[in-house]
Curated annotation (Swiss-Prot):
Family of the protein in this entry: Belongs to the LCE family.
Disulfide bonds: none
Alphabetical UniProt keywords: Antimicrobial, Keratinization
Bias (Low complexity) ranges: 1-13
GO terms of biological process kind: defense response to Gram-negative bacterium; defense response to Gram-positive bacterium; keratinization; killing of cells of another organism
Signal peptide boundaries: none
Function of the molecule: A structural component of the cornified envelope of the stratum corneum involved in innate cutaneous host defense. Possesses defensin-like antimicrobial activity against a broad spectrum of Gram-positive and Gram-negative bacteria, both aerobic and anaerobic species. Upon inflammation, may regulate skin barrier repair by shaping cutaneous microbiota composition and immune response to bacterial antigens.
Chain spans, region Disordered: 1-29, 68-95
Record protein name field: Late cornified envelope protein 3B
Organism (species): Homo sapiens
Free-text tissue specificity from the UniProt record: Skin-specific. Expression was readily detected in adult trunk skin, adult arm skin, fetal skin, penal skin, vulva, esophagus and tongue. Not expressed in the cervix, rectum, lung, colon, or placenta.
């Protein structure tokens, strides 16, 4: 075995690259379902979010009262789903 081949075998192994930090998850807008706030990225998007609510289920409505198909009343705490498609579900029948 030649001298040059021995030198190649004795070279140190390349170091492993340092692990990259995982990307930070963007903060989500998750206030209580009964509170309204200004639309933020990752929460309420689209034209229906203008002046709407940021809800935990990421659905929007224009006012704090649900626009139900049958009536414009808000059944607080009833747990019934809304009739309006642009009003969030799972908020006790209210946005």
């Amino acid at each position: 075995m030649s001298c040059q081949q021995n030198q190649q075998q004795c070279q140190p192994l390349p170091k492993c690259p340092s692990p990259k930090c995982p990307p930070k998850s963007s903060a989500q807008c998750l206030p209580p379902a009964s509170s309204c706030c200004a639309p933020r990225p990752g929460c309420c998007g689209g034209p229906s979010s203008e002046g709407g609510c940021c809800l935990s289920h990421h659905r929007c409505c224009r006012s704090h009262r649900c626009r139900r198909q049958s009536s414009n009343s808000c059944d607080r705490g009833s747990g019934q789903q809304d009739g309006a498609s642009d009003c969030g579900y799972g908020s006790g029948g209210c946005c």
